[in-house]
Design a protein with these regions (language model features):
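PP2C/PPM-type serine/threonine phosphatase catalytic domain
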Residues: 1-262
């Protein structure tokens, strides 16, 4: 559960950091979840933040895990179709009668953020209040950090957005910039503690970059900060780097930067 303890592990290029909360602040349980797959050509990551028990987290993780072979097959599609296909597939799972029946039987509900990187693009599907960032020097200069916006009244589980007449979620696709892109996914425990330093994306950008420090150490330092700020909620981080050698889009009045891929 990692109560009063920071645990950071690396799986290939992907770092997962977990912190169960500060016991002296009243932490008793860890209801976060994480799932990552990678094969070198793509990454598939899920981060979850359960409410009122971890049963909904377990349900979502187990449901997606059972679809590994099907999702792996979808990831072989061309870049032009892969994101639409994976989104449609996941939404079909979440909207299936069998999954919705299981949701009715669990205690509590969960926020769920899914991310896929393939080639020089990144796609996400967000239900709830987890956040995903892309940190890059060019984006930093323009104050651009987050891909999604936190939604505080969306969940999967006993209270289920997919039970609504119109399910509510957000999704999107972004082109990654040329060079190093640092992808960071967090649960709200990283943001909502003490002085709430990381509710300001610039602070998280600064603490996840620089000083020739390994990514694993950056993640550890951020979670140590949460501990010292008496974070009561569990906090989870998934992060990895993607070095993009493809040309990125620039405006037409910067011809010196515009390159045409042949």
């Amino acid at each position: 559960m990692c109560l009063d303890e920071v645990s950071v592990k690396q799986y290939g290029d992907i770092v997962i950091g977990k912190y169960g909360g500060n016991i002296s602040a009243g932490a008793k349980k860890n209801e976060d979840g994480a799932l990552v797959w990678s094969n070198g050509d793509w990454e598939f990551a899920v981060i979850l933040d359960g409410h009122n028990s971890a049963e909904s987290v377990d349900l979502v993780v187990n449901t997606i895990q059972k679809e590994y072979e099907n999702i792996k097959a979808i990831m072989k599609e061309s870049i032009k179709t892969v994101f639409r296909s994976v989104e449609n597939y996941i939404l079909t799972i979440f909207q299936s009668p069998s999954f919705k029946e299981k949701c009715e039987r669990v205690k509590g509900e969960t926020a769920c953020l899914i991310c896929v990187r393939k080639e020089n693009y990144i796609w996400w599907l967000s239900i709830g209040d987890c956040l995903i960032y892309v940190f890059h020097e060019e984006l930093h200069k323009l104050g651009q950090y987050t891909l999604n916006q936190r939604q505080f009244y969306e969940w999967i589980g006993n209270v289920n957005t997919f039970d609504l007449p119109i399910p509510c979620y957000s999704s999107g696709i972004r082109e990654l910039r040329t060079g190093k892109n640092r992808i960071v996914m967090v649960t709200d425990g990283v943001l909502e503690c003490g002085e709430r330093r990381y509710e300001t994306p610039l602070n998280l950008y600064n603490d996840m970059n620089g000083n020739n420090v390994e990514l694993k150490e950056h993640v550890h330092n951020v979670l140590e900060h949460v501990h010292h700020q008496f974070g009561r909620d569990s906090a989870t981080i998934i992060s990895w780097d993607y070095e993009n050698d493809a040309y990125a889009t620039y405006p037409s009045d910067q011809p010196e930067k515009i390159k045409v891929k042949k």
